[in-house]
From Swiss-Prot:
Gene Ontology, cellular component aspect: host cell endoplasmic reticulum-Golgi intermediate compartment; host cell plasma membrane; host cell rough endoplasmic reticulum; host cytoskeleton; membrane; viral outer capsid
Family: Belongs to the rotavirus VP4 family.
Pfam families with a match to the protein in the record: Rota_VP4_MID (PF17477), VP4_haemagglut (PF00426), VP4_helical (PF17478)
Keywords: Capsid protein, Coiled coil, Disulfide bond, Hemagglutinin, Host cell membrane, Host cytoplasm, Host cytoskeleton, Host endoplasmic reticulum, Host membrane, Host-virus interaction, Membrane, Outer capsid protein, Viral attachment to host cell, Viral penetration into host cytoplasm, Viral penetration via permeabilization of host membrane, Virion, Virus entry into host cell
Motif range (YGL motif): 448-450
Biological classification of the source: Viruses, Riboviria, Orthornavirae, Duplornaviricota, Resentoviricetes
Organism, scientific name: Rotavirus A (strain RVA/Cow/United Kingdom/UK/1975/G6P7[5])
Keyword Coiled coil (UniProt): yes
Segments for region (Hydrophobic): 389-409
Protein name: Outer capsid protein VP4
Motif KID motif boundaries: 644-646
Keyword field contains Disulfide bond: yes
Region spans: Spike head: 65-224
Region Spike body and stalk (antigen domain): start-end pairs: 248-479
Amino acid sequence: MASLIYRQLLANSYAVNLSDEIQSVGSGKNQRVTVNPGPFAQTGYAPVNWGPGEVNDSTVVQPVLDGPYQPAPFDLPVGNWMLLAPTRPGVVVEGTDNSGRWLSVILIEPGVASETRTYMMFGSSKQVVVSNVSDTKWKFVEMVKTAVDGDYAEWGTLLSDTKLYGMMKYGRRLFIYEGETPNATTKGYFITNYASAEVRPYSDFYIISRSQESACTEYINNGLPPIQNTRNVVPVAISSRSIKPREVQANEDIVVSKTSLWKEMQYNRDIIIRFKFDNSIIKSGGLGYKWAEISFKAANYQYNYMRDGEEVTAHTTCSVNGVNDFSFNGGSLPTDFAISRYEVIKENSYVYVDYWDDSQAFRNMVYVRSLAANLNDVMCSGGHYSFALPVGQWPVMKGGAVTLHTAGVTLSTQFTDFVSLNSLRFRFRLAVEEPSFTITRTRVSKLYGLPAANPNGGKEYYEVAGRFSFISLVPSNDDYQTPIMNSVTVRQDLERRLNELREEFNNLSQEIAVSQLIDLAMLPLDMFSMFSGIESTVNAAKSMATNVMRKFKSSKLASSVSMLTDSLSDAASSIARSTSVRSIGSTASAWANISEQTQDAVSEVATISSQVSQISGRLRLKEITTQTEGMNFDDISAAVLKAKIDRSIQVDQNALPDVITEASEKFIRNRAYRVIDGDEAFEAGTDGRFFAYKVETLEEMPFNMEKFADLVTNSPVISAIIDFKTLKNLNDNYGITREQAFNLLRSDPKVLRGFIDQNNPIIKNRIEQLIMQCRL
């Protein structure tokens, strides 16, 4: 029947040993190679400590002083100080709103007695009485009029030994400096027509942002920095502020050295790294109040971004190292909330991000030196994860944060089904941040780090920007590509596809009709018919079968049969040479050995349930290695697998070995087996449940463990497709004959098909429960 596929795999999986040996010998072969040192070799010299080379810094430093600029009328930007630096007496600056205020600032040299001077202010000649009694300080006088034809009046003064003056538009006021240095302060005048206020300076000036007002005050009181007082500083026209900035080519390829065949290229690149964490959350069995594990998993992310007008396709893999294991135990009762282990990354942990993109820099990244990178920091904050309890309020794990600081960059390799990709591995060290993480409704609080429950905090990805640079030895002909050396790496892409395949397989369980399942289970499915649902199977059947056998050889089922075969060989060697060993089923001494081990366990283990669990673990091996006419659990398992393969769109040649191996181990975990002795039936399940009953009346009787062990040794083991509870329920509600009972006990497929065709709800429900257990 359908379980023939498993028997074929068990019989043929050992035939690939020679192929494995040849492959291992080939991969472990050593080869002597003579290298002719070229112009890039450092032969005959001590080891060289390579420096990082040229790494462009993209940090923008905003200067405090913007200037100096040549005198010219312009619209002073709001929120910026104009710092004037006149060199001779006279009108320094004029400012007006053309409606209610005209301001003209005059500079008077030291030691001037009261006298009348003529100044040109706003295009008109005006006579003003001025004086400066100080012998050391220069005097700025603010002359203001409030009408076009009005007279000027003195409003304020600034005595300065630095000969500097400041003016700013902000908050509908015109601010200036008054008082005496080194204690000059600002003062503001309301302006009626604020938007149209114009300023005309008559000396060189600087522009300082209001955010740097403290620096401006420092200059007014104590003078400009020495660098501004040299003849090398030349004022420029204020129109230069309107020149549009030109983008610098930050991403560049530099030829360091070149010969006829090889050249050294330095690649400087901007980079945007996006990554995310993944996790695995596993619940324990039982009533649903306990969790077994919450751990980090490697996560892949693919994205596009623009670099100098070019769209770059990038791929990252994020993994963690140095995790910290925490646990919580709310009590010993089955209904007490508990987490056996949950992982947290803290200061002693590291985060690795492997980055690759499709740009020219990564095309020949094989022989690399002078690798360096500068990256920004990124903060990762945890989100909420609710532990869904069957009853009561749910505990919630929330909070936790860490900051990732760059700690270095190395080369790494990402391996896919089609190509090996040399990539950059960015290493980040961690620092814990606020907030701490807690588990509500428990004593767990104020712990620091990032737990694995929800490390992405609702974000699709985290992003880091920066630059990297390295020098690569590449072929001089750009059309050539350096071959990438073979490397053994984790196949993250296949694992991602398997996860998608598992999810699709589990969703397909609801689409399998029970009648179709029985039909498939009755077919003699071999390896080729199992593969018939895969595209291009005929061309690749041989290699696919070899891959399936190689993978299946390491499964738990194959290992168990291998151990059993060894024990049978030992038992057979102890039998007289004249005895003919025809099959596993006829070698009674080997199974007697199992019986003896089971009887020894009777005295050691306290409960019959534990004894049944121990012996039932071998019942599948007893059944699978002997031919029986009835349907067994492996027939159903193989039939479900075949039905899902035919419907799946994710399965392919590479995923099939993992699928079949995982199905052999995980499909139908809760199995029950029975042995029949006349009118008595003994039934034992992998969950520790056991029954003994009369076939005629389905009346229970005491379970004799020793007799059960003897029957296992000498009698056929049958899969309890229709277990005792279902059988009794069927008899109580519908009534069955003695012959029907025997046929159901033997798992006769024709009788099962008859009940299903009659749409019997009890039998259909039992088969559907078995189908739902076929999950990856």
